[in-house]
Regions:
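OB-fold and OB-like single-stranded nucleic-acid-recognition modules
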Residues: 1-142
Length: 142
């Protein structure tokens, strides 16, 4: 399968970014990596993350059929070992949670991947409730 991932220039927005990743068997793949997947106590990893030029607004175009029109068995192209431990809260109590591989974090691990820069105007995130107050999320009134 093929994924073309739109990336915008990084301007202090949270989110994953395009990185080369070395797997356990030494294979090198292109991945969208979330901050939670990075060992922030490793200065080398932190430097790579901080110097990244782009991040992913999650604009993907996906090809899920082969050249004969047959659907790929997408499970064969995922990496079940890419789950991560994150911190969540419930009733004011901090909890650790095991997150299974996400769609682009592990579910598309072995896909052919192309990163392309897209215009910033395509990026209108809603990461928190106040983002809905921004002009780009308001209805057009004529």
């Amino acid at each position: 399968p093929l994924r073309v991932c739109g990336m915008v220039k990084k301007e202090n927005h949270p989110g994953g970014g395009p990185f080369w990743v070395k797997g356990e068997n030494g294979e090198i793949t292109k991945q969208v990596v979330e901050t939670a997947q990075v060992n922030l106590s490793d200065n080398n990893q932190l430097k790579i993350l901080e110097e990244a030029s782009h991040f992913s607004p999650v604009d993907f175009i996906c090809g899920v059929k082969d050249y004969r029109g047959n659907h790929f068995d997408l499970e064969k192209f995922s990496n079940p070992d890419t789950g991560l431990i994150t911190t969540k809260s419930k009733d004011g109590k901090e909890l650790k949670a095991l997150e299974l591989p996400g769609l682009w974090n592990g579910g598309m691990y072995y896909w052919l991947t192309v990163f392309v820069e897209v215009p910033k105007i395509t990026f209108n995130p809603v990461k928190e409730i106040n983002d809905l107050l921004k002009p780009e999320h308001q209805p057009l009134i004529s």
